[in-house]
Design a protein with these regions (language model features):
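N-terminal leader/targeting pre-sequences
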Residues: 16, 20-63, 68-171
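Bacterial N-terminal signal peptides that target proteins for export
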Residues: 1-10
Length: 171
């Protein structure tokens, strides 16, 4: 190849790479019932779903349920403004439900004795695009942490207890 072709080819490849769409992502700030920041959750598209990276602090130790809820509101102290679980397909609750589960259902995570949790979860039933399963649909959603572990089957919320932290998911 001639020396002048290599820079032109490199420029063309760089333009193609940088013009590709980047994966959608967003950060969510979580607050407790008193309005205090208890951490950040990073969301990004991964495969056919959304990766959920938790960086949390000042939470009660133990296992906790976590779900995407349908309404982008987090009015304390009970966070009921977040509405029910995100459920665009009208299914029952629980990853172990024989009838399918809410799109917003996820596995439990554990908070350590110091009140911290750094964990990565995944929700294969949601996305960050623009269809009915998008966490951004209808103006957004909320992500809610519950006081107890989700039993993965009891409708409508897995007996996971009170809502103890909440963050709004928007673009």
């Amino acid at each position: 190849m001639k020396p002048t072709i290599l820079p032109t080819l490199a420029t063309a490849v760089a333009l193609i790479i940088f013009s590709l769409p980047s994966a959608a992502k967003t950060n969510v700030e979580l607050k407790d019932a008193q309005g205090k920041n208890v951490g950040t959750i990073m969301l990004w598209e991964q495969g056919s779903g959304v990766a959920v990276q938790l960086h949390l602090h000042d939470l009660p130790p133990g296992e906790h349920g976590i779900h995407f809820h349908q309404t982008p509101k987090c009015d304390g102290p009970d966070f009921k403004s977040a509405g029910p679980h995100f459920n665009p397909d009208g299914k029952k609750h629980g990853l172990e439900s024989p009838d399918g589960h809410h799109a917003g259902d996820m596995l439990n995570f554990t908070v350590d004795a110091k009140g911290k949790a750094d964990a990565k979860l995944e929700d294969k039933d949601v996305n960050l695009s623009s269809d009915a399963h998008s966490l951004f649909s209808n103006g957004g959603t909320a992500i809610v942490i519950h006081a107890k572990a989700d039993d993965m089957k009891t409708d409508p919320s897995g007996n996971s207890g009170d809502r103890i932290a909440c963050g709004v998911v928007t673009k």
